[in-house]
Amino acid sequence: MRIMENPFISLLEKVSQTTQKLTQGVSVLNNLDAIEIGTTEKEQVWSCDKVKLYRYQRTTEPLVKTPVVVSYALINRFHMMDLQPDRSLMRKLLDLGLDIYVIDTGYPTRNERYLTMNDYINYYLDEAIDFVRESHGIDKVNLMGICQGGTFSVIYSAIHPEKSKTLLPCHSG
């Protein structure tokens, strides 16, 4: 004899599970300040409007002469590449001997509603790359773009091949 499952009890169990997950989620959100991300030391070296350029701090001399400029998405935060000391792309790249810069466009607000891709690519990205080139006395940088920053990097490298030595677009689809 087969026992039929009571759909009402099944629904109540699912509602209870969802309520528990929501309660846990609210608890996590209430304690976000206690979570420390982006722990790899960096220094702001350039800014224009609300766009900032950070240089990650090295404890040794870089093994690679040409620095890497990382362009990230406008919506997500570049901190996603530096979650914890043992889960940090930035820390790993530094450990591999690279000199790393990252561009922070800040959170878009209504004030930026008239900015175009041209502004972000041919003004902010170009100015940040020129700063790095001049600081190091070099003609070209290595350019790494992640998410929307990958798209920006591909476009930038096509427009300014004289400034981009190596292009690494990541998840730029």
What does each model-found stretch correspond to?
Residues 137-140:
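Short helix-loop-beta connector
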Residues 144-149, 153:
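Gly/Ala-rich beta-loop-alpha elbow adjacent to hydrolase catalytic centers
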Residues 155-160:
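Active-site signature of alpha/beta-hydrolase-fold catalytic machinery across serine-
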Residues 1-38:
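N-terminal targeting or regulatory segments adjacent to alpha/beta-hydrolase or S9 domains
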Residues 38-109:
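Short, surface-exposed "cap/lid" segments of acyl-processing enzymes
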Residues 115-135:
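Alpha/beta-hydrolase active-site loop
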Residues 162-173:
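A conserved short beta-strand
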